[in-house]
Amino acid sequence: IGHEIGHGFDDQGSKSDGTGMLRNWWTAEDEANFKAKTGALVAQYNAFCPYDDGETCVNGVLTLGENIGDLGGLSMAYKAYHLSLNGKEDKVIDGQVWRSKNREEAMRRQMLTDPHSPPQYRVNGIVRNFDEWYEAFGITPDNELYLPPEQRIRIW
């Protein structure tokens, strides 16, 4: 649900006002900040290249709306989960829902045409921007997915 709510504020949904009218309602500063953050997210996803050819990579522009939805969705779900605990100890919830196995041809086609990032990047590309993930799993700079705090993206 959080992912779908996030679409209301992604690269497309953010172009409509609160009544659904297509108009620019952003201040110049807010729009510049949004573009800087989404540009950084595009760059992160453009760097996900599952094959050694260096040519078949996730298209960060094509997948931007879905990646924003995933990023916002995780943040909303995490906050809602902690509210539901009412002070009780939390349990670790992982990303197994996105486990998959794809043939190379299908994966290459997906990266050219599908606005959704491949499953492993829908998980790894999002959690590496989420400070709470580092705390929950003790992620340190020697981990492959580690991003320095100043490179982590939080749009909302």
Functional labels for PLM-detected ranges:
Residues 1-9:
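Short alpha-helix carrying the canonical HExxH Zn2+-binding catalytic motif
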Residues 8-156:
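Zinc-dependent metallohydrolase catalytic domains
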